[in-house]
Amino acid sequence: MNNLIGYKNGEFLPLTQCGPNILDFGFIHCDATYDVMPIYNGKAFCLDRHLNRFVASAEYYKLQLPDVYYLGIIRELYKRNPIDNAFVWFMVWRGYPESGNPRDIENAPINFAMYIKPSYPLKVDGAPIDVELSDGLRVNDSYYWQQSKNMAWIEFTKNQLIRGPNYDTIVLQDSDGYITEGPGFNVGFIWENYIYTPLNNCLHGVTMSVVEDICEDNPGQFERCNIKPDMWNWADEIFLTSSSGGITKTQRSGKVTEWLQEEYIKRTKHYDYVTEL
């Protein structure tokens, strides 16, 4: 990782020089947003969807993005760091004003960075991931809109650290008692040939949007809705989606999840979804 080249504020630099200052509001106040796009076999996947979400998130948090050619930067990063299966990170965060006053937000400069690094699955050995439905609470949309990506993972981290001993990760609920998402992934439920995923208090992930595409192109039904914890026991199958793991099996996955994985892999090679680098 230390020998990678990144991009920050108009320059290509060693990745170790692309991060925030410890005084930056993006670091001490989570005043930042980001997005992560996968590269499969040297091709960017769902570039427009990731960029559109990144731009929308930056607008939501009032972080002014520079006028840059994103694809050009990605191609140069890929040229300098030729990793065929990777992540591209887009990041923007608020720096600190000369006054140092945390209320002097308007005078804090905006920093923008991008970098590429090797990808990793949710579980290194590719085995199903064991997921626990936690009674921990996800931050509500009424506090800040969870469809805008943010750096505030504290509720995920806290509950991940106290998960059951036989589980790899957790899914949180909201204050109304509905299932939301896990740290870095959406959750999908298969029940009676329908696919359900949470509607509120969660990120609407790009990978889950590809699952929705699969259902539109094939005889399957997809619905975003409020999901009670009972579904955890009723569902025929449970799967996870993320930019890092694509469609990932859990201890509750079966043939439908395997079919979704096959369809997803097809799309990682399809011209409608990929961009040449």
Model segments located where?
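Helix-start/capping segments and mature chain N-termini
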Residues: M1-E76, E98, R103-L277
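Ordered, amphipathic secondary-structure segments that act as subunit-interaction surfaces
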Residues: K79-V92, S99
